[in-house]
Structures are given as C-alpha cells and as structure tokens.
Amino acid sequence: MLSPKRTKYRKYHRGRMKGKALRGSKIVYGGFALQATEPCWITSRQIEAGRRVLTRFVKRGGKLWIRIFPDKPVTMRAAGSRMGSGKGAPAYWVAVVKPGRIIYEMKGVSDKIATRALKIAGYKMPVKTKVLKPL
C-alpha cells in the first residue's frame, strides 16, 4: 500500500474540502481516466483495491497511472480510551480528493476493456466516479 517515506509532521489537522480540484483534473498520461465527482478521503487500501482490479482486468495489456497519493495521516484513539490525554496515534493514510480529480489513467487497451475496468474500479471507491474517454 502507498504511504510517504517521511513527512514534515507526524500528525495533521483534518481540514476542509471546499470547492473543486484545481490541479489533476485533466487527462495527462493515458487515454481513459476515472474521475471523482464528490469530495472525500480515499485511503491507501482503497487505492490499492482499485489498482488490483485494473491490473487483473486488463491482464498483461495496457499501462496504468495512479494520479493520487495518500499523504495525510489519519489518527485513531484506542477503543475504550477515555476523553482527553491528547490526539491518537497515526493509523492509516488518506489522499484528499476533491470533485473533478482524476484517480486512475489507462492506456494501451481497447475502449470496451478500459471502460469496463475503470467502472469496476469505481465501485471500490468511497465516492461517485465517472469514466472519461479520449475526445
């Protein structure tokens, strides 16, 4: 699963997801893409689940690009711990995804296979997605 080698700080604020994605909303590498239509946090496990679906569905053909990276740690307190005594330890990593952000890109496979594979990968995401095709 994806995670940063090192970060400036161990724990981060939750933050807010306002507006649309400014960057990463256009197809750059491949021909087909999976685009988020809602704001959410996508965990490194969910990114990996989508990647597995795509690589298995296209078998040996095609190239895949993952356009998001989980760089934000999410902390969790131990179950049954009382209030107070600081923030919990980092539990997992998430990528902050705004509407319009491209999650995956594909190239080198047929229209039918790419569309079907990206649609299945979209079911693994915690957000509504749409498949973008080349013009």
UniProtKB/Swiss-Prot annotation:
Which InterPro entries would you find in this protein's record?
Ribosomal_uL16 (IPR047873), Ribosomal_uL16_bact-type (IPR000114), Ribosomal_uL16_CS (IPR020798), Ribosomal_uL16_dom (IPR016180), Ribosomal_uL16_sf (IPR036920)
Q: Which SUPFAM superfamilies match?
A: Ribosomal protein L16p/L10e (SSF54686)
Keyword Chloroplast among record annotations? yes
GO MF term set = rRNA binding; structural constituent of ribosome
Query: PROSITE patterns, alphabetically?
Result: RIBOSOMAL_L16_1, RIBOSOMAL_L16_2
Q: Which GO terms describe its cellular component?
A: chloroplast; mitochondrial large ribosomal subunit
The places in or outside the cell where this protein is found are: Plastid, Chloroplast
**Alphabetical list of Gene3D superfamilies matching this protein:** Ribosomal protein L10e/L16
Its family? Belongs to the universal ribosomal protein uL16 family.
> Quaternary state and partners of this protein?
Part of the 50S ribosomal subunit.
Question: What is this protein identified as?
Answer: Large ribosomal subunit protein uL16c
Q: What is the lineage of its organism?
A: Eukaryota, Viridiplantae, Chlorophyta, core chlorophytes, Chlorophyceae
What gene is it encoded by? rpl16
